[in-house]
From Swiss-Prot:
Compositionally biased tracts (Polar residues): 136-147, 168-177
Lineage: Eukaryota, Amoebozoa, Evosea, Eumycetozoa, Dictyostelia
GO CC term, one of those recorded: phagophore assembly site
The name this protein goes by in its record: Beclin-1-like protein A
InterPro entries: Atg6/Beclin (IPR007243), Atg6/Beclin_C_sf (IPR038274), Atg6_BARA (IPR040455)
Coiled coil regions, renumbered to chain: 1047-1150
Organism: Dictyostelium discoideum (Social amoeba)
Amino acid sequence: MKKSDSSSSLVFSGIQIEINNNYGSGSGSNNNNNNNNNNNNINNNNNPNNNPNNNGPPLRPSSEWVLLSSSQPTIATTTNLTTNAPLSDSMIMNYVGNDNLNTPITPSTSSPYLKRNNSNLNSIIENSNNSSPSNAITRNNSFNMDPNNNNNNNNNNNNNNNNNNNNGEYMNSSIVFDNNVNNNNNNPNNNPNNNVHSNSHNTNNSITHSGSITSSNSNNNNSNNNNNNNSNNNNNINNSVNSVNSLMMNSDKNCNHQFPSDDVLISNEHDIIDLALNKEFLNQYRIQTNSIFINSQHVINQDVQSYQDYESLLSSYNTILNQLLLITSSNKNNNNNNNPNNNNNNVTSPNSLLSPPSTSQLQQQQQQQQQSPSPPLNNNNNNNNNNNNNNNNNNNNNNNNNNNNNNNNYYLMSTSTMSSTTTNLSTSTNSNINTNIPTNYNMSTSITATTTTTTATNTIAIGTTTTAAITTAATNSTNSNNLNLSSTNLGLDNNFLYQRILPEILSLLEKLTVFSRNNDTEIFNRLGNNVKLIFDHLNLIKNDILEANFSHLSGIFTIYNHTIISSDKTTKQFVFRFLHSLAPMTVPPAIVVTPELKKVVQKIHFSKPTFTPLCIEWKEICKYIDVLKSVSLFIAQVGQYCFLNQSIIINDELLFIPSIYVLFDNIQNLSMKEERFHIEYILHNLKFIVSKIPKQTREFTKTEIERLYSYIRGNPSYVKEILPKLLKNIYIDPYFYHLWNNHCIHLLNNNINNNNNNNTNNSSNNSNNNNNTNINIGKDIGNDLTLLLVSNKNSFLLSFDERHFSIFYSSISNSTTTTITPTITSPNNNSNRINNNNNNNNNNNNNNNNNNNINVNNNVNNNNVNNNNNNNNNNSNQYIVNYFDNTTSLLNFIESNQFKYIILSNKEVETIKFFKSVLPVTLPLPQPSSRQAILQQQQQQNYKPRILCGPCLSRFKTILDEFDNEESIENQIYSNYLNNINNNENIDPNLIDGNENKINGNDNNNNHDDDEKTNNNNNNNNNNNNNNNNNIYNNNNIEDYNNNNDNNYNFENEINDKENEFRELEKEINEIEKEEQELIKEYLELENRNQINLDIKQKLEDILKEIKLEEKTHYDLVNNYYQEYFDLKQEDEIYTNQINAIRDQLERVSQIDINKITFKIELPNTGVNGGIVGYNESSNTTISSINGFRLGTLSNLKVDWEEINSAWGETSLLLYVLASQLEFNFQNYKLIPMSSKSIIQSKNDKMSYTLYGGDNIQFSRSFLWFGASDQRFDSGMEAFLSCVNDIATFVQSKKPSINFNYRISKDKIGDSNRLLSIKIAGNSELNWTMALRFMLSNLKKILDNLDSIVESKQKQQQLQRQQSLNNL
């Protein structure tokens, strides 16, 4: 059979993403589902040519896990489950079946994984999808060569059990993971005395409100078998449920050890079995652990009191969720009662659902189920069984269908999840569509209980579990014994019940707030803060109740993928871990089968609050420089890219994701502007952030940029809601990141015009209406694609395989044609196949021929059946399969509007192989900074290992031993299988021919009659023929043996000779063995010597390493010494040069006479006899100066009094400095130099005299004429001259060698020839000026000899001191 690839998809709240993946192998047709031990039935579906799994050995047998503990009773084959969630028709045992290690996690679950049932090998429940051989003990001591022969039906006299399509277009079974609900075995052909459970692959099944599964094609058995199976189912179902609940509610907490957050999914997990199971997941999730989490993650050590408080809060939380779920389920149950075909006499009130049923009520219900056989609760073959003689019993049973177990659903509710919906879908009901489909109500964000006065909508669980939700007409039943609630009253009652729970929610919110404030602890697991999750979830529920909006959608996550049912355990582990890494703990994934697609596709649903924190371990992110906060835009002309002229640095790792949300929230308004460059700016921001994620993230392609442009232009909310979530997943989730980098995730060009949810059509009240009303959303798209294409406006599509889209669609029926073939794509050769498993239209074929491959002839027959069904007013959907190589062709077909319903499905794939090829062994981590390295080192130092108590250690060891034993058994089974294959290759061809003849004879006898009795007779005849053939074959073997004995007698002598030779050879062999033993001893001695030599060599090498290390240390010390020496020497030279430079400067400064520089006196030239050269008034040199100020005036050269006064101030300052340095005190006067206003004060009478004059002073022009003068000024000059005379006398006393040129007498000064007065009165300008010059000359004489005078004075003082000492 050709392997064909198909697609599965994943829709993530606002994000649709496509993922490419290679199919490892097509899903083989599981045709060999019935292995009748009594040989009364020959399975004609054993076609090795159509089964690719027969071409080679099976996969390695995987461990089989059951949810029941060893002390619980075994679950028998069941056909009816009292469950609150929809079950797949062919998967009843996966919660208790093998390969299923991924139980949905709820806070009340004792373990996130499943326990192993080791009590009885015969009770191991086998999965129909398990491709490994089963244990011989569980297979009635017969080794099954075909890995697909998983069902052993004893005493099965019916050949119409394997009505399975052999196309391989879809999986024949599906797995149901729906919180506390186990799967169901839908084949009622099992013997109740047989403990081996079989999973039939009947696809024409339906799902009822009670969660039971009925098989329409398997009801052709005798009544005894049916009754036994039904009673057996009713006896064992409650045991299964009680076992599940007891295991989930009672967890063994042997000690207070803690698990790292990346190992478990529940914070309060203490079951030691999880630690043992951890080795199963260690290798698979090391990649994710290395990418997101670090080994130094905090280990929370909580005290008992805080933990008890947390568990009490969690218990209250679960109680509220249970009550909400009961109210929601009451809506669903009352909708069942409103069904006109429902003859249920039970009266269920919404108020009665607030408490679980009592034990007596459960026992009564079980006894009622055991007293009468449980017929199929919902059979879709009311009018389609006219052409088959074997369906008479089935028609009789259809008249008594009821939902007796409907009221038993509510004690199997989910304790942690609740439903939320996207849209309300409605179509009119018909006889072929089960209108009583229960939905999986999982608590995630809000309550779904939307009802109207005319319709009671079965809303969709976990963000709409069914994409083709059928709206049932809310009409009053005609049965007088039923108490039905109208939809209006039901909505009001539920609203009242929701309001009653509101105070409990508010109270728990207050307790959660107090708990988070009072306890400085963090109850973290790998999915986030549980307390925070509960708080956010309850707030969402509270808001929904207050707003009376019970169908509000806060988030949806849907996976359309069949890899979950692969027998490859690692694939399922990967998929579930991938889901759990994205989902909160309180909203685990649940697998649900929709009513329209229950035989074709399965969907995994769980919803997620919008603002729920996901993975906690954040890594340091780069500095992001692009935030729009009141910043103007600068538009570049090249490339239409926009840049900011202001930036904000975000370097806090905890603010990266929030800052992205803030950024896109701020720039959302730009997308609503008409200019193109605004959207270009948004795209530039997106590309910039992706390029800065520290994982070398790939850039967007041109096609993706164009699609993003169209998305943003079409829907402005796309910027705020979708893009941040895409970046968040790339940044947080390692799988998402690597799939993105390897071009497995890219944008889907979804050009379908999406409308709001208000386009939902109400279904008709007439349940017999044959015209279905599809939901008009843009194009005419069926309900099965509604969730995929409408749940989120412009979104990404994530599919694990995109190589080929396998699409099933129902054509538009009209009066002329029944099938419209699309012209956009060219389908493969398999496109003309018809899905015979839908709508139960396989009744025209013989019992045995229904299991054959469908061909073109079957297509014609089935078309006839569809026409007949239309005449009988039965709406039978005909599904045609096409293959599309790319997404564009699929979307073109969708837009062509050539179908009524469309179904996306895919086959079993080995996804994990592709992921292993994509993901490296260890993901690269960004290099931590020095600060991060220090923090990580400190965290590692603070890390405390887990300490287990004695019971835990012993239990842990016991479980590991069990694992090892079972693994060895599985290895033995697998090796036996390989040995059997090798033995089969050596079988005598004659025996093979005989077996083929026997099988061919049986096949010929099974193809004659259509009547059931005739088939049974033929089967018996075939068995007799087989026995006869076996007897003849045995007789021939006896004759051949006698002939061989005659010949063997002649060769006895030769045999004796050979025996003698054999003995001699044995002796030689013994001798050789002795020699071999000696050689082995020698070899061992040499090995010992060699080992000793190696030890010596190793010691010498160690010594050599130590010597080299010491030598290296020595040379390092020497190098350091010389390095320090040369550094010090260089510093010494630098300091020496600095000292020399300072000394030179000091010498130059010391040679400078500060007094001469400060007081610069200029005198006119003098003659030989002391006279003045050019003694006339015209000579400018007559006037002396000090520091540039002239002291005196002439008749022909007038000097301003300001300059004269300044000169007098400098002169008084000079005299004051000389007296200070000579330590001389004037006897009569005190100098007060004040620049141009200097004065001199008498010490006797304290009179002050000025040393400055003014313009009022006039000199005498002749001897007889006196001028005007200032008496104080003249007295001051006379006093000043007296001071000069005193200091000159003091200098001569100290140093007699100094001779002054001019002598002073009272107010006159002069040489030996002439004395000139220093007063102005009666004096001329020339004489006054000359007198001042003489005075400055004497002062200059003292100034020039000041140093020698001081030195002479010091010497005299020393002599005096010496004399005084001598005198003493």
